From Swiss-Prot:
Record function comment: Catalyzes the ATP-dependent phosphorylation of L-homoserine to L-homoserine phosphate.
Gene Ontology terms describing biological process: threonine biosynthetic process
NCBIfam families on file: thrB
Protein family membership: Belongs to the GHMP kinase family. Homoserine kinase subfamily.
Protein's name in the database: Homoserine kinase
Top-tier EC class: transferase
GO cellular component entries: cytoplasm
Main location: cytoplasm
Documented EC number(s): 2.7.1.39
């Protein structure tokens, strides 16, 4: 059995902690065989546990505890990931969704998508990454009084270009630079920008969407000092035809929304700057969580 989960890119500027997209990088978890102990084969580095301390298995345990279910066996697993770690592309969220589905499959829980999303939000804290990892495409979500409401929609047609710096930026570090509160006037302005961003995405107006994502008042201006590449890439985007540029999740990945016919040009112009990192041309993943050879 294989569980496949896409990477995600959250916030899109003004959609802070609420809007996310699934993109074409993937985490794969394969169940190999029963084992005397849990064991995970991976090549993700020495800092990622290979036993029950791994986020995949702590998530599985949390789901089983929530459902008051025990597994009759432990398993040898293989985890492979194209998703860069601690770069703002939802690496932890993809593992959380995989862990929930692993519990769902092995314990035959028959969880609905809504139940999976509820569990994921309880573990992750907010829906902007876990929702598109689970559901694919563009997801706009909010959790109010413990209940997560979400809308899934087709993302406007365009290419995505992700610049992934070689340095990590932990979400907790990126959140430390945010203000504790906004004034009422600031909150109204930030909310209105987010409203227009949402409407423009849902009506396929990428020109307006790009303007609104770059006008964010919630987080990007506070985080910009942590990611020096953001402003440079935004300027390149303006000069060579990108719809918009935003900080993916908590960073440090910078994402550009690009007309398909400008992707090659923008890639070349960014590569000319010799930035330390990697460029990924990406597409929207419209499937979300996938299971091959389900145990059901």
């Amino acid at each position: 059995m294989k569980i496949i989960v896409p990477a995600t890119s959250a916030n899109l500027g003004a959609g802070f902690d609420s809007i996310g997209i699934a993109v074409s990088l993937y985490l794969t978890v394969e169940v190999l065989e029963e084992s005397s102990d849990w064991k995970i084969d991976h090549d993700l580095g020495e800092n990622i546990p290979t036993d029950e301390r791994n986020l995949l298995l702590t998530t599985l345990s949390a789901v089983l505890e929530d459902k008051n279910v025990a597994l009759p066996a432990k398993y040898h697993l293989k985890m492979t990931s194209e998703v860069p770690l601690a770069r703002g592309l939802g690496s932890s969220s993809s593992v959380i969704i995989a862990g929930i589905e692993l519990a769902n499959q092995l314990a035959k829980l028959n969880l609905t998508s809504d139940e999976k999303l509820k569990l994921a939000c309880e573990i992750e804290g907010h829906p902007d990454n876990v929702a598109p990892a689970l559901l694919g495409n563009l997801v706009i979500a909010s959790t109010v009084a413990g209940k997560t409401s979400h809308i899934v929609a087709d993302f406007p047609s365009c290419a995505l270009l992700a610049f992934v710096p070689d340095y990590e930026l932990k979400t907790v570090e990126s959140r430390q630079v945010l203000p504790n509160e906004l004034t009422y006037k600031e909150a109204v302005a930030a909310s209105s920008i987010a409203n227009v961003l949402t409407a423009s995405l849902l009506t396929n107006n990428l020109e307006v969407a790009g303007q609104m994502m770059e006008a964010d008042r919630f987080h990007e201006s506070y985080r910009a000092s942590l990611i020096p590449e953001l402003q440079l890439l935004r300027e390149i985007g303006h000069e060579f035809g990108a719809y918009g540029t935003y900080l993916s999740g908590a960073g440090p990945t910078v994402m550009l929304l690009v007309p398909d016919n400008k992707l090659t040009l923008l890639t070349e112009k960014i590569m000319e700057k010799n930035l330390t990192g990697h460029l990924y041309p990406l597409k929207i993943d419209n499937k979300g969580l996938q299971v091959e050879e389900s145990v059901f």
